[in-house]
Amino acid sequence: MRILVGVLCAVTLAAAMPRQTLTAATSCDKLASLALPNVTITLARDVAPGAFMPTADPGADDPPPNPRAFAGLPAFCRVAATLKPSSDSDIKMELWMPAANWNGKYEAVGNGAFSGAIGLAAMAGPLARGYATSSTDTGHAGNTGRFALGHPEKLVDFGWRAVHEMTVTSKAIIAAYYEAGPRLSYWSGCSAGGRQALMEAQRFPADYDGIIAGSPGLDWTGRAAQAVRGAQLLKDESARLSPAKAQALHKAAVDACDATDGLKDGLIADPTKCKFEPGTLQCKGADDSSCLTAAQVETARALYSPLANPKTKRETAGLQPGSELGWTSLGWTASARATGLDQFRYLVFRDASWDIDRFNSQTDLARADEADEGIVNAMNANLKPFLDRGGRLIQYHGWSDPQISPGNSVQYYEQVNKLLTGVKVSDSYRLFMAPGMGHCRGGEGPNVFDPIAALEQWVEQKNAPEQIVASHMTNGAVDRTRPLCPYPQVATYNGTGSINEAANFSCKRP
């Protein structure tokens, strides 16, 4: 009981802690006896410097993380726990805490897709920077939606509860280990982790002081419907685009839209400012790899187009011109298609035999939205509680993302601004769109940048990010840098100097 009281006091007093590095106040193994509500600590062990070697998660579909991700880690206390906020919950989590030189801060990391594994590799970075860090499997093993069939509480865990419970538990264990809770807490995630980021800001505004929401799957049901619709349309092989035809379509899109920002640089600064018509590529004679058949033109139009919920009239965005190099033979990425199928099979119709052939584009997005009830979709635009308590949110998205439409990020940012009239949203929440960047990373445009450094400056030094410089690399060498700008600003060439150097661009409204 003494430890539990100490935990509560330390969390309460965390904000008053001086900004200095701290060393553990108790031994790691003693945390095994820590009593917390609905929590069973299954491991509390010291890890020597450079000694951690991951193994495959028993329930995960992914291979074990690359050991190189853990090279050079400092000594840390490794804690594993199982959380049971409901009778059907089985949430696994890990928390890593530096044995010495803790920076007094906590950074949790997000997941991907259906998230059935703890993100050990993602935890390595924060730990190396002096953070206490944690991750969760969101309450199930494996990266499919099968876990939700017949288990409504597990769906709630996946949708939002597991991350919040992990956060509360992590802060309590941190307080017990250092006799001081974290003075600042951060969240960082991309894709499903970006969805988790926005869900935390919406539901639990006090959990985190700063949040990174990368390429967020906030419109979970809409993305699922779009991906399934695309796969259904493309079951007709004559409508599919070969890699060569996708390349030709991509070139046509870039040729048509590249100069909308006044600069021909091989990147589309904002695809929404260009009305690209794939019909311009329709074959005028014999079919070959440089043109599209009439059926393939319709495929492209469908993949670019939004899909509407006929009951609420809301639209979920399609893919954007410039994303074609990431398309598969069935349109959206294989991951998007798999999670889309599982969404309808296990979460909407709750029928393991349901197949893509049964998808109805006129009615099934509405059914998916109704079944979700805000459990997984993170589209609540009321961020006022998070902003009012001083929270800071950086959201980013690649314009060439072939897995989660960047249009959904723009829609959400605009909805927040529309709802919070009288609030200068950009003082606390900024969206950065990355021309030519794919899903979370990669692509023809600059796609390597450090959003957490920008967030730390914003939260801790009150320096709002006016731009974030991103790099493009080829064979490990930087060959282009460009500022990412707070939406709706775009990087605008100053007129002189190399177009491959960020210093020659300014962020301006178009």
Residues of each region from the PLM?
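Alpha/beta-hydrolase fold nucleophile elbow
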Residues: 180-191
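Glycine-rich nucleophile elbow surrounding the catalytic serine of serine-hydrolase chemistry
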Residues: 189-199
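A catalytic-pocket lid/entrance helix-loop region that shapes and gates access to the active site
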Residues: 199-201, 206-308, 433
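Short beta-strand/loop motif that positions the catalytic acidic residue
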Residues: 394-397
